[in-house]
């Protein structure tokens, strides 16, 4: 992730994998509600989160949602990063 990777499906898959792995670790530590990872959180990075205009501008957008331990709906965080730069 980062470096000079192109802002494409490969980068997005890498982001989903790495962020998903981090969120799964938090899930296993009891950080979220839900009995399965898919009930506890989601990671979305694709053509819906990152438009062609974003790609043209070198921006990748990631949505991360999670079900907090305290009663609430999902908390959703949008992260934008210039592709090819360190996070």
Region spans (language model):
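Structured, hydrophobic secondary-structure cores that serve as assembly/anchoring elements
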Residues: 1-87
């Amino acid at each position: 992730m980062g470096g000079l990777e192109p802002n494409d499906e490969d980068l997005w898959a890498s982001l989903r994998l790495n962020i998903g792995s981090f969120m799964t670790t938090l899930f296993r530590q009891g950080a979220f509600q839900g009995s399965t990872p898919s009930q506890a959180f989601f990671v979305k990075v694709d053509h819906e989160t990152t438009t062609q205009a974003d790609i043209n501008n070198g921006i990748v957008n990631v949505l991360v949602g999670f079900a907090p331990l305290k009663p609430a709906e999902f908390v959703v965080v949008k992260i934008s990063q210039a592709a090819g730069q360190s996070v």
